[in-house]
Amino acid sequence: MTEYKLVVVGAKGVGKSALTIQLIQNHFVDEYDPTIEDSYRKQVVIDGETCLLDILDTAGQEEYSAMRDQYMRTGEGFLCVFAINNTKSFEDIHQYREQIKRVKDSDDVPMVLVGNKCDLAARTVESRQAQDLARSYGIPYIKTSAKTRQGVEDAFYTLVREIRQHKLRKLNPPDESGPGCMSCKCVLS
């Protein structure tokens, strides 16, 4: 059974724990209890493959930022979560993404942008802004509500699919010897 190491990152109070607990326990956590670091495991079937999700729910508070490098090193894929009613959390996504890329020493890291709390009427981040950001990063964007469960499975399962595609790209890099100048040896005289 394949195991996937998923890491949930984002600013404090965006609903990282609520999303994770909704996926694992089918339960919405109403009260805010700041997380330092929690780990969850769940066996699921995604596209016919039974797999084990190893999910690390991380601290959003700045005082725990020193711990980030360590869990970013071990993570295979990242859910980058912001709250649609919190512009600052949306702006913070760039910093999380840059830190992930720096720690992984790669521009090609599986990620999904997640706009949480989409059940709320009051929104300060428009869907278009999030879609544009995701497009500029070359990653999927999923709207979620930990409260109603909307998009919760989709977000985590999409990340697993991104990890699978990433692994395939690493196993089968693009063919460098295709048509064009690289494939023939030319002698100029």
Curated annotation (Swiss-Prot):
<keyword id="KW-1043">Host membrane</keyword>
<keyword id="KW-0472">Membrane</keyword>
<dbReference type="GO" id="GO:0007165">
    <property type="term" value="P:signal transduction"/>
</dbReference>
<feature type="lipid moiety-binding region" description="S-palmitoyl cysteine; by host">
    <location>
        <position position="181"/>
    </location>
</feature>
<feature type="short sequence motif" description="Effector region">
    <location>
        <begin position="32"/>
        <end position="40"/>
    </location>
</feature>
<keyword id="KW-0564">Palmitate</keyword>
<dbReference type="InterPro" id="IPR027417">
    <property type="entry name" value="P-loop_NTPase"/>
</dbReference>
<dbReference type="InterPro" id="IPR001806">
    <property type="entry name" value="Small_GTPase"/>
</dbReference>
<protein>
    <recommendedName>
        <fullName>GTPase HRas</fullName>
        <ecNumber>3.6.5.2</ecNumber>
    </recommendedName>
</protein>
<feature type="propeptide" description="Removed in mature form">
    <location>
        <begin position="187"/>
        <end position="189"/>
    </location>
</feature>
<keyword id="KW-0378">Hydrolase</keyword>
<dbReference type="GO" id="GO:0016020">
    <property type="term" value="C:membrane"/>
</dbReference>
<keyword id="KW-0547">Nucleotide-binding</keyword>
<feature type="modified residue" description="Cysteine methyl ester; by host">
    <location>
        <position position="186"/>
    </location>
</feature>
<dbReference type="Pfam" id="PF00071">
    <property type="entry name" value="Ras"/>
</dbReference>
<dbReference type="GO" id="GO:0005525">
    <property type="term" value="F:GTP binding"/>
</dbReference>
<keyword id="KW-0488">Methylation</keyword>
<comment type="similarity">
    <text>Belongs to the small GTPase superfamily. Ras family.</text>
</comment>
<dbReference type="InterPro" id="IPR005225">
    <property type="entry name" value="Small_GTP-bd"/>
</dbReference>
<feature type="binding site">
    <location>
        <begin position="57"/>
        <end position="61"/>
    </location>
    <ligand>
        <name>GTP</name>
    </ligand>
</feature>
<keyword id="KW-0553">Oncogene</keyword>
<keyword id="KW-0342">GTP-binding</keyword>
<feature type="lipid moiety-binding region" description="S-palmitoyl cysteine; by host">
    <location>
        <position position="184"/>
    </location>
</feature>
<keyword id="KW-0449">Lipoprotein</keyword>
<keyword id="KW-1032">Host cell membrane</keyword>
<feature type="binding site">
    <location>
        <begin position="10"/>
        <end position="17"/>
    </location>
    <ligand>
        <name>GTP</name>
    </ligand>
</feature>
<keyword id="KW-0636">Prenylation</keyword>
<feature type="binding site">
    <location>
        <begin position="116"/>
        <end position="119"/>
    </location>
    <ligand>
        <name>GTP</name>
    </ligand>
</feature>
<dbReference type="GO" id="GO:0020002">
    <property type="term" value="C:host cell plasma membrane"/>
</dbReference>
<dbReference type="InterPro" id="IPR020849">
    <property type="entry name" value="Small_GTPase_Ras-type"/>
</dbReference>
<feature type="lipid moiety-binding region" description="S-farnesyl cysteine; by host">
    <location>
        <position position="186"/>
    </location>
</feature>
<dbReference type="GO" id="GO:0003925">
    <property type="term" value="F:G protein activity"/>
</dbReference>
